[in-house]
Regions:
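Conserved acidic segment of CheY-like receiver
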Residues: 14-27, 32-36
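Active-site residues of response regulator receiver
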Residues: 68-70, 100
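A short, hydrophobic beta-strand element within the central beta-sheet of small alpha/beta folds
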Residues: 91-105
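C-terminal output/effector regions of signal-responsive regulators
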Residues: 145-212
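Receiver (REC) domain switch/output surface
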Residues: 129-140, 145
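Acidic, metal-coordinating helix/loop segments flanking the phosphotransfer/catalytic sites
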Residues: 46-64, 72, 191, 198
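As written
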Residues: 77, 111-117
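Short amphipathic alpha-helix used as the core "switch/output" element in two-component signaling
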Residues: 78-91
């Protein structure tokens, strides 16, 4: 039962994780690095361009990627996310956080097929980053069994685990329903996928359900 896991001890988790910061401004990269170090992170790499970031992800596997949406010239953060997903350089057990000053729905939603795990808006304070990272790391640790099966393309097993998580009264209900709909779609079960989208829209107005 996934939801019965003890609360994640973040102070013990940070030193074990690897981080990649992608931003075209050196001062911002340095600021984020200092914040992560203060949380206990020890393995922190940085990139100033999309090309360098994708190269790094080809040779190294990062647990957490913090990527600015607007990188100036070349690919933006959304395009990096899409390329990493398509080339399977970014596992579902990893976390991709989009950093953006943009607040429009078009940017926040991005390409519906490839969405980041979370967003953080500039300017970023240490408190805000610590809180957001803590939420995402806790979620990822609790849902790791599901994401591990997705990475292995064991979609039927992932569906079973998602259903168990929902039965256990998970706090990540929206994520589970969204993931279930995607998994049914991958298995060609459009009937169940459509049912989830419709059921969700009858209770809450969620962008991903409307897009589905």
């Amino acid at each position: 039962r996934l939801s019965t896991l003890k609360e994640v001890k973040l102070n013990k988790l940070y030193p074990k994780l690897s981080f990649l910061i992608i931003d075209d401004f050196e001062n911002f990269r340095s600021s984020l690095r200092l914040m992560l170090s203060s949380f206990g992170a020890q393995k922190i790499d940085t990139s100033s361009t999309a090309e360098d970031a994708i190269t790094k992800c080809t040779y190294d596997s990062y647990d957490v990627i913090l990527c600015d949406f607007n990188l100036g010239h070349g690919q933006n953060g959304q395009q990096i996310l899409e390329e990493l997903r398509i080339k399977k350089r970014l596992k579902h057990t990893h976390i991709f956080i989009m950093i953006t000053a943009e607040t429009s729905k078009d940017v926040v939603l991005g390409a519906r097929e490839y969405q980041p795990d979370g967003y953080v808006a500039k300017p970023i304070t240490r408190t805000v980053l610590e809180q957001r990272l803590g939420q995402l790391l806790t979620q990822q640790q609790i849902l790791k069994p599901i994401n591990r099966e997705i990475d292995l393309e064991n979609y039927a097993k992932a569906i079973t685990l998602c259903q168990q998580e929902l039965e256990n009264g998970t706090r990540y209900k929206s994520w589970c329903y969204q993931t279930l709909a995607k998994l049914y779609g991958l298995l060609g079960d459009t009937s169940n996928a459509t049912k989830i989208y419709r059921d969700v829209l009858t209770t809450r107005e969620l962008p991903w359900a409307r897009l589905g």
